[in-house]
Regions:
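A short, Lys/Arg-enriched amphipathic alpha-helix followed by its capping loop at the start of a domain
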Residues: 2-11, 30-43, 240-243
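Asp-based phosphoryl-transfer active-site loop
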Residues: 3-24, 47-48, 207, 237
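Mg2+-dependent phosphoryl-transfer enzymes with acidic/Ser/Thr/Gly-rich catalytic loops
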Residues: 4-9, 197, 204-306
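Short loop/turn segments at strand-loop or loop-helix junctions that form parts
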Residues: 10-16, 79-82, 88-90, 128-131, ...
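Well-ordered, non-membrane alpha-helical segments in soluble/globular domains
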Residues: 29-32, 103-116, 145-171, 278-284
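Active-site phosphate-binding/coordination module
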Residues: 29-130
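A short acidic (Asp/Glu
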Residues: 56-60, 88, 136-140, 234-240, ...
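Conserved acidic, metal-coordinating active-site core of Asp-based
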Residues: 123-225, 232, 238
Length: 306
């Protein structure tokens, strides 16, 4: 095990920057090419996602493994916003580990599953692959407008089940404490799903898990790049910045609003989602091969506030 830290570490959201939001797979071949090239060059890769471990193993990792991951590659997958994790090497994937303290109580999870399957089967499907969270995802043949119109009602029904079970819940910024005044869970809607989860989960917890896991396999990079498509993804860079790492964040969907942060924010001109992800991965591959390669330029820009 070398004692020299790698020159760079990558902490990557999956949906948007890596997996196409349309196909929900790696649709751009160069993304898989560059991820493998970076990993085989000794750059630690972390996939930090709200998705399940099964989603990564079945939809995202196969093209990487097909291209050949070396024995020196360090790839960590943190799933369900920090509740589940596993590693990847040339032999394949390890068994997932679950932090059971972050799971929705079993009886409540069953009631939520029953509601999803019986009352909302024309709106969402129950994600059977989640181990700690309860997730209901929009049916692929349903329009976004129709889904979002009914999502509010779905979320309200989920809230009723949870509060009736004595759980303290946060939903859309409003807190509903339990009898002791505690709020330990949240209902977290996205544009294609609702996640029902412990409020300890988040992309910042995923970043913490990633650094801990990488520390067990070798030196930790001081310089990091995080990539995401939503405001919640900035929590990855927030955590790294707060812990004195040199970090910049790439926002692949900046039109939704770029917050003020104490670290640099990069954007890709004229590209969003996985097209933007492909552009920055290609630039980092070139940079690792030749350290004189500028990170900014050629369509990659430093975001300027205002």
């Amino acid at each position: 095990m070398t004692s020299t830290p790698p020159p760079l570490g990558l902490l990557l959201d999956v949906d948007g920057p890596i997996a196409s939001p349309i196909s929900r797979t790696i649709a751009i071949d160069s993304i898989a090419d560059d991820l493998v090239a970076l990993a085989n060059a000794g750059i630690p890769l972390v996939f930090n996602t709200g998705r399940s471990d099964a989603f990564l193993r079945e939809r995202v990792l196969p093209p990487l493994l097909e291209r050949g991951v070396s024995a020196d590659a360090r790839i960590v997958c943190v799933c369900e916003k920090g509740a589940v994790w596993f590693t990847v090497d040339y032999r394949g994937t390890s068994e997932p580990i679950v932090d059971e303290s972050l799971a929705i109580p079993e009886a409540v999870a069953r009631d939520l599953e029953r509601m999803i399957r019986e009352d909302y089967d024309d709106l969402v499907f129950f994600d059977e692959t989640k181990r700690a969270m309860v997730s209901a995802e929009q049916l692929v043949d349903l329009s976004s407008e129709d889904y979002l119109e009914r999502q509010l009602v779905f979320d309200a029904d989920a809230l009723q089940i949870m509060t009736a079970a004595g759980l303290g819940v946060e939903r859309r910024g409003i807190r509903y404490p339990n009898d002791t005044g505690a709020v330990e869970y949240r209902i977290d809607p996205t544009v294609i799903s609702t996640d029902i989860e412990s409020n300890r989960l988040g992309k910042d917890l995923g970043a913490q898990r990633a650094v801990e896991l990488l520390g067990a396999t070798g030196p930790i990079p001081q310089r990091w790049r995080t990539v995401g498509d939503s405001r919640s993804d900035y929590a990855m860079a927030d955590w790294l910045s707060e812990h004195a790492y040199d970090v910049a964040h790439v926002d692949v969907r900046p039109a939704e609003g770029v917050p003020d942060k104490p670290y640099p924010i990069l954007v890709v001109d004229g590209a969003i989602n996985d097209e933007a992800g492909a552009a920055v991965l290609r630039r980092w591959t070139e940079l690792v091969a030749d350290e004189t390669t500028p990170e900014v330029g050629g369509g990659i820009s430093l975001h300027v506030a205002g």
